[in-house]
Amino acid sequence: MLGLKQVHHIAIIATDYAVSKAFYCDILGFTLQSEVYREARDSWKGDLALNGQYVIELFSFPFPPERPSRPEACGLRHLAFSVDDIDAAVAHLESHNVKCETIRVDPYTQKRFTFFNDPDGLPLELYEQ
């Protein structure tokens, strides 16, 4: 048996490290656990935690190649975060000029959800518990 326990982290490459770090920490509520500038690669690496659990590895690299942006491009589609109150979460995001899609209802679970984007256009989802 392979023995997977849980997702350890998700790596995100940003075009502007400072902007993305501020978005994930100041707006979404992640905390910066550690940060290092790697001079040889002209690259930043930050480890971000959510509710005390390390979850995102945020990188910057000079001139990263673009990824396909069509809604159903092959590969990782989006990251989803659970929230207790989606209306309050959307209001918080919108107060920081983050545009959210209209809240929808999952026809299978009857739970409410919405999508928004990080500064580089990575789709993120809020899913009400």
Swiss-Prot record:
Transmembrane segments: none
InterPro entries named in the record: Fosfomycin_Res_Enzymes, Glyas_Bleomycin-R_OHBP_Dase, Glyas_Fos-R_dOase_dom, VOC, YwkD-like_dom
Source organism superkingdom: Bacteria
UniProt entry keywords in alphabetical sequence: Metal-binding
Domain VOC: 6-129
Single GO MF descriptor: metal ion binding
A Pfam family annotated for this UniProt entry: Glyoxalase
Residues engaged in binding a divalent metal cation: 9, 57, 78, 125
Protein family according to the UniProt entry: To B.subtilis YwkD.
The name this protein goes by in its record: Uncharacterized protein YaeR
Organism whose genome encodes this protein: Escherichia coli (strain K12)
Organism placement in taxonomy: Bacteria, Pseudomonadati, Pseudomonadota, Gammaproteobacteria, Enterobacterales
Underlying gene: yaeR
